[in-house]
Amino acid sequence: KAIKAIKDEFDFILIDNAPALDFFTTNSIAASDYIITPVREDGFSRKGLKEILDVVNEIKDEHDLDHVKFLGTFMTQVNPRTTMVKERTLDYQKNIPDLLFHTYIRNDTKVAQMESKFVPMLEHSLESNALFDYCHLLMEMEILPDQVAQKLRCSIGEA
């Protein structure tokens, strides 16, 4: 109900949940139009993703939420130099080819520093690999404002 009251005032409302299948997650799904979930490169995340997809479908059926769509998943806390990330990416591409975003979020110590200070990434370090990756993810989702996307492209020499 709270989100319905403000929904028209925003282009996007992001709801970030703890990795749990609980009351808060259920309410977040019910309040959403689209669901995006991060996964790590470990086996637990693969199993958890399947559980999330099952729960989303159950909640949609129970509460008649046909409008809710699972938009996709992206890998986070990635060390691109490991063979595990390559194997896991191939696994996801094989099993959920239309649901895996190409952009992944690199493991970055600046994220832990930011979290320990309760400071948003944009205020902590503009040189964060994770911040750069999240911006790329938003560009891939086509939800990053044009002026921000243009600045990002200029900063990496794509403009």
Outline where the language-model segments fall.
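C-terminal lobe/tail of nucleotide-utilizing enzymes
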Residues: 61-159
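Generic hydrophobic alpha-helical segments
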Residues: 2-3, 17, 137, 141
